[in-house]
Amino acid sequence: MRKILFTVLLCTSVLNLHCSKIRERKVPEFMTAKRPTPELVYQCAKHYKLQHINIVVAQSILETGHYKSDKCINYNNLFGLYDSKNKKYYRFNTWQESVKAYKQKVQYKYKSGDYYAFLKRINYAKDPKYIHKLKKLSWDDLEYSCLLY
């Protein structure tokens, strides 16, 4: 009987300790945010280990018109990711899924070198001035400039 009681108490203590550690873990702010901001997209891209994060954040701003476009609001699609097979823009449950999809659908092709040249090479955007606009946004947007450091 003493062994059973000891075992029950020990298991209860271990379970309580485990549960308290789970409660202590903080969920990163970007994971629970309903609407994207440059700072949250930056954190999310860093979490998913995207490369050239500053450019990726600039793309999200440019593609969504500062997160105000229909594709952003209704599809949670921050990058204008398009399914050429079904001829539709991808829909995501959350904007965070869009960031993760960017890595899977765009960056998996990237090996090294000039990222702007890579985007041009894969015909990322139809706009012939896209890279110029992206570079300008990367340096001129005051809201975004805090992310450069």
Enumerate the predicted regions with their spans.
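Sec-dependent N-terminal signal peptides
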Residues: 4-13
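Catalytic cores of secreted/periplasmic lytic hydrolases that degrade extracellular macromolecules
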Residues: 18-149
